[in-house]
Amino acid sequence: MKYVRLGRSGPKVSAVGLGFWEVGSRSWGGDPSLAHDLVREAHASGINLFDTAEVYGNGRSEEALGAAVRKLGLRDEVVVATKVAGFRPSGYFIVKGAAASARRLGFAPTLLQLHWPPPAWIPLCAAVRGLEDALRAGLAEYIGVSNFPGDMLERANACLRKAELVSDQVEYSLAYRTPELDVVPRARSLGASIIAYSPLAKGALAGARPSAAAQRLDRRFSAASRDGDLQEALRSVAARLGVTAAQVALAWLVDRGAVPIPGTRRPERVRELAGAADVKLSEADRELLDRASAKYVTAWGRKYGNLRALRYVPCGLQYAAIKLMGGA
């Protein structure tokens, strides 16, 4: 496993991390009891970055991840990242959310992120400075954001008084390359890292069948699953290198400087995912994958827009809807 630094001054993390959305999430049918085995296998494979959020299963994912890390005695050896929800309208509520996340985890996270931008009528700086307040309160060691388009990432970073945003966690994969148009170049200019969620397009780039609601309802999963050119390119490169299609898709992101955080409900798959960090793509491999996925640079729009609709939903309604659904 190789390790990279988040941002200019953030923690050193494994080139491939592990996402815990699937653990505790109703949309994935996740089982929190799997967290212990997932963390154990990940640590044995060199993975030290684990990502969760307060809305994943209404906190169940945080609780499961925290319990696993504590039971295995790994707190000082891993980087735990969590996200406070974008429905928190001010610094006071962001600090309150960070404290609640720390209680569920059983410790303060290493990296605290704002999961999505606040509603349009709330000053961006009020929310982002809440992350800085949480930092000063000892509720995290580093701060970042998630689902921020490039221009907003730049504005958010300018809001900070002393701290810096070490990362922007966005959806990024061979099936969704829109971040290359705005997020990636802006992050690079600021010295922030890209953490890539859904790096396998919810399993479509690994040849998965749609077994969960999160897959069946996702347009990008459907598009990538049916894209013969992209699937053939993945199979071709995988066969040449003697690895899996999933490892090729993750290696493509690592090669571009992103830190992918794939998720899984199967502990036996963790070593495969970790192995992607050691896959070496040739120039011909890169060209083939770039060409097969070129349509996905603009197919979903010319500006990153995940969760953009939430910017026009009042915080109270966001909170109530997520609670009623049992979390994300």
Model region roles, listed by residue range:
Residues 105-121:
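Active-site groove signature of glycoside hydrolases
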Residues 14-15, 51, 75-78, 108-111, ...:
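Short acidic capping loops at alpha-helix termini that bridge into adjacent secondary structure
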Residues 76-88, 111-115, 169-172:
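A short, structured active-site edge motif that brings together acidic residues
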Residues 26-29, 53-62, 87-92, 119-122, ...:
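Acidic-and-aromatic substrate-binding clefts and catalytic sites of carbohydrate-active enzymes
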Residues 117-299, 305-328:
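Beta/alpha (TIM)-barrel catalytic core signal, keyed to glycine-rich beta->alpha loops juxtaposed to Asp/Glu
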Residues 7-10, 66-76, 99-107, 133-135, ...:
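Acidic (Asp/Glu)-rich catalytic clusters
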Residues 29-42, 90-105, 126, 151-154:
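Short, acidic/polar
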Residues 1-78, 316-317, 321-328:
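N-terminal binding-site loop/beta-alpha segment at the start of enzyme catalytic domains
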